[in-house]
Amino acid sequence: MGQKINPIGLRVGVIRDWEAKWYAEKDFASLLHEDLKIRKFIDNELKEASVSHVDIERAANRINIAIHTGKPGMVIGKGGSEIEKLRNKLNTLTDKKVHINVIEIKKIDIDARLVAENIARQLENRASFRRVQKQAITRAMKNGAKGIKTQVSGRLGGADIARAEQYSEGTVPLHTLRADIDYAHAEADTTYGKLGVKVWIYRGEVLPTKNTSEGGK
């Protein structure tokens, strides 16, 4: 199953935390849809800002949003102008008080979503699918990744029959729950149709911390 399931979902509650932290009973569906609306809005507003993922916390009538990005300066803007505009738009969208925290991603070459989107952008600019994958793998390994696997699928090079080609380096232990594996997929719109891009990056092992109050050592 480790080969098929989403590596992030498999590790939630083991070495990964939830990206949405709130509890609701009867309002669960409406709040979940609001979360999806917020994430879609942020992705559209910050298309060029290299946003990896968004964490959402709720408390009463307040929403705390953490934006993990490779370009914090673009999100914040000069003197905080851009982030203030974004906050006002989100306040209007949700009709709640929104607080935004921007977190910088130090190593963008070992963040799966940023790597996948970078490959997709290059494919849209007619770059060679083999070259962009090999370049992404080289950069990731230089920046401390223990292993990486990339896959591009679709009408590669304009071929009549769609196929998938993947490249890898190092190890990517998908079955090991303590392995910190980041995964993402992206799409590239080319003249021959869509190409799918998948990226798995192994960043080393994470040992779950034991709770000493429950008898752990």
Curated annotation (Swiss-Prot):
It holds the Pfam family Ribosomal_S3_C. InterPro entries: KH_dom, KH_dom-like_a/b, KH_dom_type_2, KH_sf_prok-type, Ribosomal_S3_C_sf, Ribosomal_uS3_bac-typ, Ribosomal_uS3_C, Ribosomal_uS3_CS. It comes from the Bacteria. Signal peptide: none annotated. The keyword Nucleotide-binding does not apply. Keywords: Ribonucleoprotein, Ribosomal protein, RNA-binding, rRNA-binding. GO terms for biological process: translation. GO terms for cellular component: cytosolic small ribosomal subunit. GO terms for molecular function: mRNA binding; rRNA binding; structural constituent of ribosome. Residues 38-106 form the KH type-2 domain. Gene3D superfamilies: 3.30.300.20, Ribosomal protein S3, C-terminal domain. Belongs to the universal ribosomal protein uS3 family. Part of the 30S ribosomal subunit. Forms a tight complex with proteins S10 and S14. Binds the lower part of the 30S subunit head. Binds mRNA in the 70S ribosome, positioning it for translation. This is Small ribosomal subunit protein uS3.
